[in-house]
């Protein structure tokens, strides 16, 4: 309405690059890529955490930011309520003839939305990421199509707004669920991001909520 962008789409690789770069600048951070949380013992003054490579560390607070299947949440004995919608999302990237002008587009019809998110050009052609939602059986059938049939189905579902679509990536499928933890904290533990709550992707608010969780935790 104001003419200003409603939001910005940032690729995961860019976010990871910038976060890793920032982490490298922080003297109080011990970054251990490839090492995960195994278990913890909560005490009055500390938590003893055992990592997947066998080492133990003593910390004042364990922050569970380890996703919807959070091991930290389970170790803190925090229950979770999950709602399943019987839908899945099919994700992939396409090239097309018409430029996307850096605008995301959603095409709605029965079964679920078909969302095109602008990406940088691929081999000189306009490129978009796609999130295609439908019931689980339909998505499984689409994921199994041969390339030509899949491109034709994606083009038809898009309404042809960018012209013929050509898939240029692997196809991934994701279950559509919502999830909420029964508590956001436990003994010497706190939950953020998808360890605490999961939303369907249609609102595109998962990252924003995760960042808000971190801001809230810092303010406590």
Show the residue positions of the predicted features.
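Conserved FAD-binding catalytic core of PHBH/FMO-like flavoproteins
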Residues: 46-56, 61-171, 176
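A secondary-structure boundary/capping signal
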Residues: 11, 33, 133-135, 195
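Conserved N-terminal helical subregion
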Residues: 1-75, 83-88
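Conserved mid-domain beta->alpha element of the FAD-binding
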Residues: 172-220
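Short, solvent-exposed loop/helix junctions and linker helices
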Residues: 8-13, 144, 208-211
């Amino acid at each position: 309405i104001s003419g200003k962008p409603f939001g910005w789409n940032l690729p995961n690789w860019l976010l990871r690059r910038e976060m890793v770069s920032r982490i490298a600048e922080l003297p109080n951070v011990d970054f251990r890529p490839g090492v995960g949380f195994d278990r913890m013992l909560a005490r009055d003054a500390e938590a003893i955490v055992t990592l997947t490579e066998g080492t133990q560390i003593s910390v004042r607070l364990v922050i569970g930011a380890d996703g919807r299947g959070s091991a930290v949440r389970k170790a803190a004995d925090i229950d979770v309520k999950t709602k399943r919608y019987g839908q899945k999302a099919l994700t992939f990237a396409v090239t097309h003839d018409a430029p996307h002008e850096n605008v995301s587009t959603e095409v709605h019809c029965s079964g679920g939305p078909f969302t095109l998110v602008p990406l940088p050009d691929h081999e000189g052609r306009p490129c978009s990421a796609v999130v295609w939602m439908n019931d689980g059986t339909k998505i499984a059938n689409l994921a199994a199509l041969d390339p030509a049939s899949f491109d034709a189905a994606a083009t038809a579902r898009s309404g042809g707004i960018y012209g013929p679509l050509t898939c240029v990536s692997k196809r991934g499928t994701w279950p559509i669920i919502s999830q909420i933890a029964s508590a956001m904290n436990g003994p010497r533990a706190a939950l953020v991001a998808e360890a605490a709550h999961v939303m369907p992707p249609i609102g595109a608010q998962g990252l924003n909520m995760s960042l808000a969780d971190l801001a809230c935790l810092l303010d406590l």
